[in-house]
C-alpha cells in the first residue's frame, strides 16, 4: 500500500493544533491533484468530523474505503462517524474490519470497544478495550476508552479511576478533563465540576461544550420532575384517604406537602448555589427550543412547588391536584428539551433524517 502524500502530513499537522478549516483546505487541495487517494480522503473525513459535519465526514470515509479497501484507517474513520450518527451496528462492522486488517494496532480495538458500547454490548466492549491495552498499555486513548465504556455501563467509580489514570499520563488532554468533570457532576461535586468545565472551555474555546456547562440546571430539572410527580401524587393520595376513610390523613397531607416542598427546594439550592452564574450564562446560548423548554420547565416546576407550599398553609385541596397535573407537562417539556438538543447536534440531526428517510421508503 502506498504511503501518505505530503499534503496529508501538512493537513494532519494543522488538524493537530486545531486549525481545522486550514487542514480541510489543504486536504482538498491534495485531493484535487490525487482524487482517489485513500489517505487524504480519510484525513478529510476526520477533519470534517472534528468540525461536526458528520454527513460529509461519512461520505468522505465511504469514499476512502471504496478507494482503498485495505486501508484500516479508512474503516476506523468510517466507524467513528457511524458512532457519531448513532448507527452502532454498522460502526461495529466497520471497526471489526479495521481490526481484521491490522490486528496489532491498538487504536482499532479501542474504536471497536466504543462502537460496541454504543450498542450496549458492554462485555464485548470491555474485552475489546482490554485487548487494545495489552497492545499499548500506556495509551491515553485506551484509558479513556475504558472510562467511556464503564461510564456508559453505569460503573462511575471504574470510569473515574480510568479517566484519572489517563490524566496522570496526559494532564492536558481536553477530553479526559471534560470526562472527569462530568463524572464529578454525576456525583454532585458541583464546584469542582464547574471549575473543570470552565477551564476546559477556556483552554479550548473553539470546542466549548455549552450543554455540559448547563448540567446543574438540567440536573435540577430532572430531579425535580421526578420529585414533584411523587410528592404531588402522595399528597393527593392522602387527600383521598382523608375524604373517604380517615379524616386525620388531611393534616398529615399538609405536613407531607411542606416537608417534600422543602426537600425539593433544598436540593435545588444544593446544586444551583455552588454552580454560580456560569450555567445561567450558558443557558442563554443554547439552541432556541432547548433553551425555551428548559426555561419553561424551571418556571413550571417552581410554580408547582409553590402550590404545595400554599396547600400546606391553606389546606385548599385543588392546589396539590393542580401541582400533580403539572407533572405530565414537565415531562413533555423534557422531551422538547431533548428534541432541541438533538436538532442542534449534527449527529442526532443526521440520525433523525436517516430515520425519516427509512420511514418514507
Please report, for each region that a protein language model flagged, where it lies by residue.
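Generic detector of multi-pass transmembrane helix bundles and their immediately adjacent loops
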Residues: 285-361
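Cleavable Sec-type N-terminal signal peptides
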Residues: 40-44, 224, 231-235, 260, ...
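Core alpha-helical transmembrane segments of integral membrane proteins
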Residues: 224-278
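Cytoplasmic membrane-interface segments at the C-terminal ends of transmembrane helices
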Residues: 203, 209-225, 268-291, 335-355
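Alpha-helical linker/edge segments of TPR/alpha-solenoid repeat scaffolds
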Residues: 188-194, 216-237
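Membrane-interfacial entry segments at the cytosolic side of transmembrane helices
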Residues: 219, 248-258, 284-291, 318-319
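Alpha-helical transmembrane segments and immediately adjacent membrane-interfacial amphipathic helices
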Residues: 150, 184, 192-196, 208-209, ...
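Alpha-helical protein-protein interaction scaffolds
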Residues: 2-217
Amino acid at each position: 500500500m502506498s504511503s501518505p502524500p505530503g499534503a496529508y502530513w501538512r493537513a494532519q499537522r494543522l488538524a493537530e493544533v486545531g486549525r481545522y478549516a486550514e487542514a480541510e483546505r489543504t486536504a482538498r487541495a491534495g485531493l484535487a491533484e490525487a482524487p482517489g487517494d485513500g489517505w487524504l480522503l480519510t484525513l478529510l473525513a476526520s477533519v470534517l468530523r472534528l468540525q461536526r459535519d458528520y454527513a460529509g465526514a461519512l461520505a468522505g470515509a465511504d469514499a476512502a474505503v471504496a478507494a482503498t479497501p485495505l486501508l484500516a484507517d479508512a474503516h476506523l474513520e468510517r466507524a467513528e462517524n457511524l458512532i457519531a450518527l448513532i448507527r452502532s451496528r454498522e460502526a461495529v462492522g466497520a471497526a471489526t474490519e479495521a481490526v481484521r486488517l491490522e490486528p496489532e494496532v491498538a487504536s482499532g480495538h479501542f474504536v471497536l470497544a466504543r462502537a460496541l458500547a454504543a450498542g450496549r454490548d458492554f462485555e464485548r466492549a470491555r474485552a475489546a478495550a482490554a485487548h487494545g491495552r495489552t497492545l499499548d498499555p500506556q495509551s491515553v486513548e485506551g484509558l479513556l476508552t475504558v472510562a467511556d465504556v464503564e461510564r456508559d455501563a453505569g460503573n462511575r467509580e471504574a470510569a473515574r479511576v480510568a479517566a484519572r489514570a489517563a490524566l496522570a499520563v496526559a494532564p492536558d488532554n481536553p477530553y479526559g478533563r471534560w470526562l472527569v468533570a462530568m463524572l464529578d457532576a454525576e456525583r454532585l461535586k458541583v464546584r469542582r465540576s464547574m471549575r473543570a468545565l470552565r477551564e476546559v472551555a477556556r483552554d479550548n474555546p473553539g470546542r466549548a461544550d455549552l450543554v455540559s456547562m448547563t448540567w446543574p440546571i438540567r440536573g435540577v430539572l430532572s430531579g425535580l420532575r421526578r420529585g414533584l410527580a411523587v410528592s404531588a401524587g402522595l399528597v393527593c393520595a392522602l387527600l383521598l384517604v382523608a375524604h373517604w376513610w380517615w379524616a386525620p390523613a388531611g393534616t398529615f397531607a399538609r405536613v407531607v406537602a411542606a416537608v417534600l416542598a422543602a426537600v425539593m427546594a433544598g436540593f435545588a439550592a444544593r446544586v444551583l448555589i455552588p454552580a454560580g452564574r456560569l450555567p445561567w450564562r450558558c443557558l442563554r446560548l443554547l439552541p432556541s427550543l432547548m433553551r425555551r423548554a428548559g426555561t419553561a420547565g424551571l418556571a413550571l416546576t417552581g410554580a408547582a412547588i409553590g402550590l404545595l407550599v400554599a396547600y400546606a398553609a391553606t389546606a385548599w385541596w385543588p392546589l396539590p391536584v393542580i401541582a400533580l397535573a403539572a407533572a405530565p407537562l414537565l415531562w413533555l417539556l423534557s422531551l422538547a428539551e431533548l428534541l432541541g438538543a438533538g436538532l442542534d447536534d449534527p449527529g442526532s440531526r443526521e440520525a433523525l433524517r436517516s430515520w425519516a428517510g427509512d420511514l418514507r421508503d
